[in-house]
């Protein structure tokens, strides 16, 4: 049995915090597949899985999110997943893992796919039908299913053969027969795409072409993925027959041609379909056209924009993925408020004259960075209408306030008994992702019945769902939803238009419909580069010029995922870029131009201009590999530096890129790209007479080249060379310890060769040349690229006696005595690390013995520092000891730091922080503690230390620290600055004090310590974090801390009493649902939906952690446990009942509907099925497993009104049981002792007279009778109840 102290324990507890705080569910889990962070996390898991060979598990998690949790949109995830195309992956390539993503049935995971899992093509059909505004015909279904079935069979054979090869150890471990089998499968797949892709868009009917285009876009993506694998992995698969250098060149031509062809085809078909809609004359046709644009954008154009990234020549394999941000906006959703023909858009005129940035559909819609939504002000009315004498509420007007202006949609009446205005405040950090509408269906006070003939429907309530799952109500009556308008996945509402209702009666001029503007969530993020992932990989980033801070003119562009910026002659444009990691980048521009145009290009790093010169942007009209868009042919151009290099050194800060058109023609700018350049170490090997070993044995000869790094290597190694004339073919073999990691063919007879070795977490590698023959003279040039190799250059080496003396003095100063058993009180952990750097720089040859002794001493100092530090992992050797934001990573190899450090990147869509709590049991009473750390670089970093209420809260700016030349006596880092007392201080080091009075083990306030970024472009690199004992408190300090603690304890007890009073009754009621009060056990046999629904969860004041906004507080954790217990009870009820969707929360799914039966939401939030009159009914046929004619069943029904439930069974339904339900209020009625004559039973619910409202119905096995119970007889009973399972679930 759950008790209060288990759910709300006295230890640990803090009025401000709770440990351990778990992550809040991603926003999508609470409402719609909306939150981009959920997709990003699943993508990280897939990336790790591909490299570790566990991708099937990662894909299984994705499929669960799609088909079970309903938190992920299939199409959106696949589109985002294509960003992995540039990853360095094993020899299986990228196509093999994606087979299981495209076809759920082919995902080779231990757990089978969800029973309702479909392939991506089947999952697209509802959107396609919505786009063409009809159901797919049987012929269309047969055509589409047949083509995809053929592809699935080929993909399954490809996958099976690849699995077979990998099970034997890879391609260099299998015989030629298996390799031929696999290459045959590769070529068959390639032929299928080439032959069958055109059939999806070549048809005489416009609908067939349009409905086939989403299929075409996915299949084109798959084909380009396969071609890229052939180009990058083919030489490893089969270098002698099918994937020779000449064949690879041919495939490179194919991929370039197909990118251009597939892009043009999608664009042309889209444009043809768009033209067919013409100029809409009313809101209905306008909405259909916009729905066409929405589906075509998300299902076709968003895929086509990625096609150029599949070209390995243009986007080669690198250390990370590629991220090309989208900024294009979509008009969605359309929300009818009051229209001419019920709550539809039929025959309602459209007026866009008051829409900013619309420009008759050719505009970009309001820029979400310039027009930031602030508030909606709604003006509802309660006014007698001419329909049945009933009051009909509706919306006169809505006032939309953004950061630029306030604009009114609709018309305010001169005189009207208004029930408003109602305000909805909008938080840009927690945007709206769904709009819910409650239509007016209930009678006003005093009315005798329901208005069943409400032909001119109206809205009684609007509510807005935010990204974190919280709801904003417009306060217009109902506030719940019978109609849900979800935005496209990973989008948010950036603006809201309104169109007036135009009629000749008194309602003319007020709002007829609302139209949303949906914007990708990444569109307003800062332009961030250089952000490493957990493996240290840095992505290639592309930012639309539409995100520029000034200049240019926005022009419509459909194919790029963003509108283009037209740069006319003399015009300039600037875009800010924030770099997280100092390093080298290649800068590229994607543009279109109809003529050769000179553009002045300026990269301003705030102290240097590595690019500051005129660049020729050549005409792209005749470019053979460019992609045609609305404004020209788009190509990618690398930008040269002033010294004609293509590598730019960019510091860790915010820089600005400026372009000025100095020519005479327009240039259309799509995006700017930053490609990280990994540190390169080139080794050239000359071996004039080497002997090659056997191709199947480990060579006994010395390797040509070996790594010497003690760090795991990740990245790629480019191999280029030329063999001498008349030489034989050979193999370049790569060994990790005693097995091959990869082989690369070397052609004989003086041919050039080039290839790439992908490296994943390899500590050492040896390179040999081996074959069954003897090699000839030749040279091999190895280009080794390793992103973890650290900075170059030779380390400093101290050889002078005075250097030894200086360093020895500093080592001794770390301790209080010569025994080295205690650290000096003013020594920080970072001080120790500076001394370590100097000790390590002592010459081994000159001071080998002394260096060994000093290293022993500094190691002891480090151990003492770690022992006194109350934080765990202060040097981030144990990152798991910290609570941290999703994108916070551990990084090594900083010139100022011996140990690892943590990088807090810009927040993006999730907060960036680290947090740890020191428990009360580790502290001493009446003691001052020092909190300190080292900051290598920080922008907008907040430091918070809290015991009784955030005693320390500082935001700091620390300039980027560059290491001084290492000397034996001087500091390692940085120019000191003056402090308030006239002394010099180090801006990179912080130190604060916090006082602890009497210990309070019951409430466990402890010391809480956190660092977080408080600005979108902020970042920080920190290390050497400590909380250590300083000194006992003086008498006056004890009195001060006692007073603070007393006040804190008073507030704590007050809040605890309030929360206890709210949660104790809920605990008691949930205990009553379960046998023996065991929340993880079985529910009691007499529990019904009403018992669960009667439990109303309280509203607790602090659901989020006080510091970590993406994690639960203690109160939030309690609410999650409550909801989990209710969900488990509900799931058991669902499992026990024989009927599906008997609670009607999924509308009438699983039921056959006759008449106008549909789900409605009542004023009190009940979701019920409404049968408006005697002509309406719903029915469901069930089959009882393990049927026993003697088994008894119980019917439980909860509803309001007059109706019947019939149960038909027996052969040809000879037996009919009828259960009547006549109650004016919501009441539970039961029918017990039911037996059936067959395993098939048809249950029908129908109205007898007027409106019949059904809350839920269940048909369950009757519990076994006890000694004092008799189950014989067919009896009925009823219980009056005003509760409902469906209260806003």
UniProtKB/Swiss-Prot annotation:
Endoplasmic reticulum in keyword set: no
Q: InterPro entries of this UniProt entry?
A: Cry_V, Galactose-bd-like_sf, Pest_crys_dom-III, Pest_crys_dom_I, Pest_crys_N_sf
Specify where the region named Disordered lies, as residue ranges. 1263-1289
Specify residue ranges for compositional bias: Low complexity.
1274-1289
Q: What does this protein do?
A: Endotoxin with nematicidal activity.
Q: Which family does it belong to?
A: Belongs to the delta endotoxin family.
What's the protein called, per UniProt?
Answer: Pesticidal crystal protein Cry5Ab
Species for this entry? Bacillus thuringiensis subsp. darmstadiensis
Q: Which gene encodes it?
A: cry5Ab
């Amino acid at each position: 049995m759950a008790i209060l102290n288990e759910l709300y324990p006295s230890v640990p507890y803090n009025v401000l915090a709770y440990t351990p705080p778990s992550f809040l569910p991603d926003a999508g889990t609470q409402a719609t597949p909306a939150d981009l962070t959920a997709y990003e996390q699943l993508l990280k898991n897939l990336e790790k899985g591909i490299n570790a060979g566990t991708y099937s598990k990662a894909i299984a998690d994705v499929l669960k999110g799609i088909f079970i949790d309903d938190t992920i949109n299939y199409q959106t995830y696949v589109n985002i997943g294509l960003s992995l195309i540039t990853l360095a992956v094993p020899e299986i390539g990228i196509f093999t893992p994606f087979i299981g993503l495209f076809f759920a049935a082919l995902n080779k995971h231990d757990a089978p796919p969800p029973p309702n899992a479909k392939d991506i093509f089947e999952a697209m059909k509802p959107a396609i039908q919505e786009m063409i505004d009809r159901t797919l015909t049987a012929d269309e279904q047969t055509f589409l299913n047949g083509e995809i079935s053929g592809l699935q069979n080929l993909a399954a054979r490809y996958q099976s053969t690849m699995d077979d090869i990998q099970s034997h150890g890879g391609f260099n471990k299998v015989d030629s027969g298996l390799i031929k089998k696999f290459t045959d499968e590769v070529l068959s797949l390639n032929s299928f795409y080439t032959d069958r892709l055109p059939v999806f868009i070549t048809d005489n009917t416009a609908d067939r072409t349009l409905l086939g285009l989403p299929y075409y876009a996915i299949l084109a993506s798959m084909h380009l993925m396969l071609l890229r694998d052939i180009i990058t992995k083919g030489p490893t698969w089969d270098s002698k027959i099918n994937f020779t250098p000449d064949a690879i060149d041919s495939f490179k031509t194919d991929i370039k041609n197909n990118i251009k062809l597939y892009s043009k085809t999608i664009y042309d078909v889209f444009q043809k379909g768009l033209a067919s809609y013409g100029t809409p004359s009313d809101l209905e046709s306008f909405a259909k056209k916009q729905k066409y644009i929405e589906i075509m954008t998300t299902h076709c154009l968003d895929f086509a924009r990625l096609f150029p990234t599949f070209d390995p020549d243009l986007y080669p394999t690198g250390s990370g993925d590629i991220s090309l941000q989208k900024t294009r906006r979509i008009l969605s959703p359309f929300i009818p408020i009051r229209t001419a023909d019920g709550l539809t858009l039929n025959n309602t005129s459209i007026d866009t004259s008051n829409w900013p940035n619309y420009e008759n559909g050719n505009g970009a819609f309001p820029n979400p960075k310039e027009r930031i939504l602030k508030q909606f002000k709604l003006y509802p009315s309660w006014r007698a209408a001419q329909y049945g004498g009933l009051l009909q509420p509706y919306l006169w007007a809505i006032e939309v306030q953004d950061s630029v202006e306030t604009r009114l949609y609709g018309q305010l009446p001169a005189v009207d008994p208004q029930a408003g205005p109602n305000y909805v405040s909008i938080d840009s950090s927690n945007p709206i992702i769904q709009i819910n509408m409650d239509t007016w269906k209930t009678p006003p006070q005093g009315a005798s019945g329901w208005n069943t003939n409400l032909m001119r429907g109206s809205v009684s309530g609007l509510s807005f769902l935010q990204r974190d799952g919280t709801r904003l109500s417009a306060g217009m009556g109902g506030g719940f939803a019978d109609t849900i308008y979800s935005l496209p996945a990973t989008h948010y509402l950036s603006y809201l238009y309104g169109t007036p209702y135009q009629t000749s009666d008194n309602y003319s001029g007020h709002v007829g419909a609302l139209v949303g503007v949906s914007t990708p969530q990444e569109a307003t993020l800062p332009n961030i580069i250089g952000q490493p992932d957990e493996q240290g990989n840095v992505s290639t980033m592309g930012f639309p010029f539409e995100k520029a801070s000034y200049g240019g003119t926005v022009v419509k562009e459909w194919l790029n995922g963003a509108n283009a910026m037209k740069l006319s002659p003399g015009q300039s444009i600037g875009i800010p870029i924030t770099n997280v990691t100092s390093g080298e980048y290649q800068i590229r521009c994607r543009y279109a131009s109809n003529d050769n145009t000179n553009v002045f290009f300026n990269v301003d790093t705030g102290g240097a201009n590595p690019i500051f010169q005129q660049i020729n942007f050549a005409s792209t009209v005749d470019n053979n590999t460019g992609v045609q868009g609305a404004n020209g042919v788009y190509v990618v151009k690398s930008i040269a530096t002033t010294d004609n290099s293509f590598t730019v050194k960019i510091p860790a800060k915010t820089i600005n890129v400026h372009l000025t058109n100095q020519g005479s023609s327009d240039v259309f700018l799509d995006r700017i790209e930053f490609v990280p350049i990994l540190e390169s170490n080139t080794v050239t090997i000359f071996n004039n007479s080497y002997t090659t070993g056997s191709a199947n044995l480990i060579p006994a000869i010395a390797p040509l080249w070996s790594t010497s790094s003690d760090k795991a290597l990740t990245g790629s190694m480019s191999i280029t060379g030329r063999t001498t004339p008349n030489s034989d073919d050979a193999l370049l073999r790569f060994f990790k310890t005693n097995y091959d990691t990869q082989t690369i063919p070397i052609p004989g007879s003086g041919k050039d060769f080039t290839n790439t070795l992908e490296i994943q977490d390899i500590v050492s590698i040896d390179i040999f040349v081996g074959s069954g023959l003897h090699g000839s003279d030749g040279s091999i040039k190895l280009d080794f690229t390793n992103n973890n190799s650290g900075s170059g250059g030779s380390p400093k080496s101290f050889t002078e006696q005075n250097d030894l003396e200086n360093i020895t003095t500093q080592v001794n100063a770390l301790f209080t005595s010569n025994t080295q058993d205690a650290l000096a009180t003013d020594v920080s952990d970072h001080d120790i690390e500076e001394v370590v750097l100097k000790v390590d720089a002592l010459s081994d040859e000159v001071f080998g013995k002394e260096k060994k002794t000093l290293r022993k001493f500094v190691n002891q100092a480090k151990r003492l520092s770690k022992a006194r530090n109350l934080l765990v992992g202060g040097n981030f050797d144990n990152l798991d000891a910290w609570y941290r934001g999703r994108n916070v990573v551990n990084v090594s190899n900083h010139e100022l730091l011996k140990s690892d450090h943590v990088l807090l990147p810009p927040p993006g869509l999730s907060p960036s922080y680290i947090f740890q709590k020191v428990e009360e049991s580790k502290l001493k009473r009446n003691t001052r503690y020092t909190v300190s750390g080292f900051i290598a670089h920080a922008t907008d970093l907040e430091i918070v230390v809290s015991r009784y209420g955030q005693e320390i809260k500082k935001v700091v700016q620390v300039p980027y620290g560059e290491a001084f030349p290492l000397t034996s006596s001087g500091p390692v880092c940085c120019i000191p600055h003056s402090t308030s007392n006239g002394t010099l201080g180090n801006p990179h080091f912080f130190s604060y004090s916090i006082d602890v009075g009497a210990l309070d083990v019951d409430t466990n306030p402890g010391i809480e310590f956190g660092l977080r970024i408080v600005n979108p472009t902020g970042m920080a690199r920190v290390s050497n974090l400590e909380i250590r004992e300083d000194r006992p408190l003086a008498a006056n300090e004890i009195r001060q801390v006692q007073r603070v603690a007393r006040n804190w304890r008073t507030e704590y007890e007050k809040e605890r009493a309030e929360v206890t009073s709210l949660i104790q009754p809920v605990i008691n009621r949930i205990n009553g649902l379960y046998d023996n009060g065991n929340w993880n056990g079985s529910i009691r046999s007499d529990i019904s939906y009403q018992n669960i629904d009667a439990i109303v969860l309280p509203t607790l004041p602090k659901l989020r952690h006080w510091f970590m906004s993406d994690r639960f507080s203690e109160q939030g954790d309690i609410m999650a446990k409550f909801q989990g217990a209710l969900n488990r009870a509900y799931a058991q009820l669902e499992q026990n009942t024989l009927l599906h969707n008997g609670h009607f929360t999924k509308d009438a799914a699983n039921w056959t509907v006759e008449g106008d039966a549909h789900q409605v939401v009542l004023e009190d939030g009940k979701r019920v099925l409404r049968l408006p009159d005697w002509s309406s009914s719903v029915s469901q046929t069930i089959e009882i497993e393990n049927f026993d004619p003697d088994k008894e069943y119980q019917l439980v029904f909860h509803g309001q009104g007059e109706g019947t439930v019939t149960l038909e069974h027996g052969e040809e339904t000879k037996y009919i049981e009828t259960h009547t339900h006549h109650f004016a209020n919501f009441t539970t009625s039961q029918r017990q002792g039911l037996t059936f004559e067959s395993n098939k039973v048809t249950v029908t619910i129908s109205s007898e007279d007027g409106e019949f409202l059904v809350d839920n119905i269940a048909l369950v096995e009757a519990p076994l009778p006890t000694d004092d119970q008799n189950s014989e007889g067919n009896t009925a009973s009823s219980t009056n109840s005003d509760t409902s399972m469906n209260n806003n679930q």
